[in-house]
Amino acid sequence: MGTGLAHAPVRDACKNTVPGPGAKGIGTGFIRNYQKWQELCVNMDTICENVPVDTSYNFFGKQVALPVFAAPVGAMQLHYGDKYDDLTYNDILVTACADAGIAAFTGDGTNPAVIQAAAEALKKNHGCGVPTIKPWNIDLVREKAELVGAADPIAVAMDIDAAGLPFLKNLTPPAGSKTVDELKEIVKLMNGKPFSLKGIMTVNGAKKAL
């Protein structure tokens, strides 16, 4: 992870100092999310057949061993240090997830090489993964959708919560938040592939996404 992160048993010392994991603003978003996760527990039900538990799940037509997926990460050297570039990281991640019977979501960034590396890794692993496109302007979304579509992924995602990132909002034309009509247009660009919106923050947002 490089030297940019402070050492702490619970990773809460780097808020607003590191792109991505450090969060933005007052830097409490990830901390509050982690605290909320501590309230969730798995309850065991022993009144059932005494057979091995089946954890498999049908994910958009792809049978996976467990409904747990690797999160999309892009621009590795910008965020996490210089040990892995995007090509190496995606090759390791997508391959390892496919070998484990699950799937990886892959990241995106302002550098075209980020999603190109993701597409190459997905193609190498027979499309076993979900490329995640940031909420760029429609022309760039179209370009990236065509690129990842050639890898025949399970689905395509968009991390719409990235709409507040300054490097997106300051582009010309600007990227960022999307209207319902804009999302409908984006869905059409997926050529029938399932489309997932990551980072919907409210119930009202979820209703509009439907």
Where do the model's predicted regions map?
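Short glycine-enriched loops at secondary-structure junctions
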Residues: 76, 108-113, 161, 203
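Glycine- and other small-residue-rich loops at beta-strand/loop junctions that grip anionic moieties
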Residues: 22, 82, 106-109, 133-134, ...
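Hydrophobic faces of well-ordered beta-strands that scaffold small-molecule active sites
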Residues: 68-71, 102-106, 127-133, 156, ...
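Alpha/beta enzyme core
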Residues: 95, 124, 136-210
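An N-cap/entry alpha-helix motif that binds or orients negatively charged groups
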Residues: 1-64
